Amino acid sequence: MKEGMIILKLISNVLTKEQAKEIVNWKYEGIYEIYNLSTWDELVKSGCSLCDDIKRNSFRGYLDEDEQLVGFTNLLDEGDEVFFGIGLNPKMCGKGIGKIITKMAIEESKRRFKGKDIKLEVRTWNDRAINCYKSQGFEIIDMINNKTYIGYGEFYIMKYFNS
């Protein structure tokens, strides 16, 4: 995708192993470095869902018109609600692509998990992501301290109410 172009259409597909390996190599800068992943081999050893052929079926890849991977989502049925995770190619951050992908994921969740609310967790300092989620109808409902692979962090729990 060329710099400054507007994406008119995104294609969604079940995330492939090749796309997952591409995601592992994405490198974020500044405060967002926290989202950089370990190597593929380390993630496989740790049981990361992205690297597991079966668990990866809950992930979707989003491609632009040039078939370049611009982001991914994970929609995981947790009984009463659906857990939502999202990642963007670092080159796409801050360009509105997250809003488009989030909207597409909400629509997919409505189709696949009829009537279930959608929940996500986001670091409390990540205003860019929080604003994206709010723009698509998510609301902050709680704050938690959560253990991650790099230690504890403060997270908002946000919910999209499907009523």
Question: Which positions does each model-derived feature cover?
Answer:
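Conserved N-terminal entry element of GNAT/NAT acetyltransferase domains
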Residues: 1-21, 162-163
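Conserved SAM-binding loop
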Residues: 12, 94, 122
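Acetyl-CoA-dependent GNAT
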Residues: 14-17, 24-93, 108, 112, ...
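Alpha-helical elements of the RecA-like P-loop NTPase motor core of helicases
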Residues: 21, 130-131
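Conserved acetyl-CoA-binding loop-helix of GNAT-fold acetyltransferases
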Residues: 88, 94-108, 131-135
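C-terminal "cap" of GNAT-fold acetyltransferases
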Residues: 115-119, 123-130, 136, 142-163
